Curated annotation (Swiss-Prot):
Organism: Vaccinia virus (strain Ankara) (VACV)
Cysteines engaged in disulfide bonds, as pairs: 34-103
Main location: virion
Family of this protein: Belongs to the orthopoxvirus OPG185 family.
Protein name: Protein OPG185
Modification(s) after translation: Glycosylated; contains phosphate and sulfate-substituted glycans. O-glycosylation is required for hemagglutination and hemadsorption activities of infected cell membranes.
């Protein structure tokens, strides 16, 4: 008896011959039954399962045990006629209930004292239809439904009496008066802001000449500046010319603006370059290094004399 559940799990027989089919609609109840051929042996246990490997129930006489979430409310079991027939009723069919159901009989001979168990199984296919007409009936009858076609042609419409008039409007020419804007820039040498200063203030008026740019050729022009110094002793005007190219030279150019004489005094304006700062830094570093060298030499001489003096005192 302990080996019967193991034998049930090893059931995998598949028949090539077609088996009965039952077709029902969704919501109906389906009753599936099977009869055993061996009526002489004693039925030990009967079983129902759904392929591929879903066990529904195991029954021994009036005792029924359900598996895989199946309940008696969904599937009822009956075995009339002294276990010659086993029947199940599936209630309220759904699409998931469709499939192949297998009933099995486990039998033993009442005259045989051995533990030999005979086995029989039968399959039934349950088809659940979603429409009122059975799918099996459609396949067996060979009927096909083709869309209806209409051979009627629409009435011919005579368009000879119809005319369409299209009015095409010709737009008037659009005149776009474009004003010619001319920008005139007048440079006069007389436009000089004069600062009357008896205090010695100076006014610088620069009148740059136009720079011509044609076909990516840049022409660098000179800038003429006038420096006017007004003092109580007189007015001195100095003209200086600066080339734009000189603005990019930071090492080799050492320009000095000519001195301006005001009332007998001379003032010199110098432009310091990077080179000048480098020279100053070099001279300063040289002085510091010289001072360090002198300090080291002095310390060495003093230390040597101190050691010599200590040695003489010990002796």
């Amino acid at each position: 008896m302990t080996r019967l559940p193991i034998l049930l799990l090893l059931i995998s027989l598949v028949y090539a011959t077609p088996f009965p089919q039952t077709s029902k609609k969704i919501g109906d109840d389906a009753t599936l039954s099977c009869n055993r051929n061996n009526t002489n042996d004693y039925v030990v246990m009967s079983a129902w399962y759904k392929e591929p490997n879903s066990i529904i129930l195991l029954a021994a006489k009036s005792d029924v045990l359900y598996f895989d979430n199946y309940t008696k409310d969904k599937i009822s079991y009956d075995s009339p006629y002294d276990d010659l027939v086993t029947t199940i009723t599936i209630k309220s069919l759904t699409a998931r209930d469709a499939g192949t159901y297998v009933c099995a009989f486990f039998m033993t001979s009442p005259t045989n004292d051995t533990d030999k168990v005979d086995y029989e199984e039968y399959s039934t296919e349950l088809i659940v239809n979603t429409d009122s007409e059975s799918t099996i009936d459609i396949i067996l009858s060979g009927s096909t439904h083709s869309p209806e076609t209409s051979s009627e042609k629409p009435d011919y419409i005579d368009n000879s009496n119809c005319s369409s008039v299209f009015e095409i409007a010709t737009p008037e020419p659009i005149t776009d008066n474009v004003e010619d804007h001319t920008d005139t820039v007048t440079y006069t040498s007389d436009s000089i802001n004069t600062v009357s200063a008896s205090s010695g203030e100076s006014t610088t008026d620069e009148t740059p000449e136009p720079i011509t740019d044609k076909e990516e050729d840049h022409t660098v022009t000179d800038t003429v500046s006038y420096t006017t110094v007004s003092t109580s002793s007189g007015i001195v005007t100095t003209k200086s010319t600066t080339d734009d190219a000189d603005l990019y030279d930071t090492y080799n150019d050492n320009d000095t603006v000519p001195s301006t004489t005001v009332g007998g005094s001379t003032t010199s304006i110098s432009n310091y370059k990077t080179k000048d700062f480098v020279e100053i830094f070099g001279i300063t570093a040289l002085i510091i290094l010289s001072a360090v060298a002198i300090f080291c030499i002095t310390y060495y001489i003093y230390n040597k004399r101190s050691r010599k003096y200590k040695t003489e005192n010990k002796v």
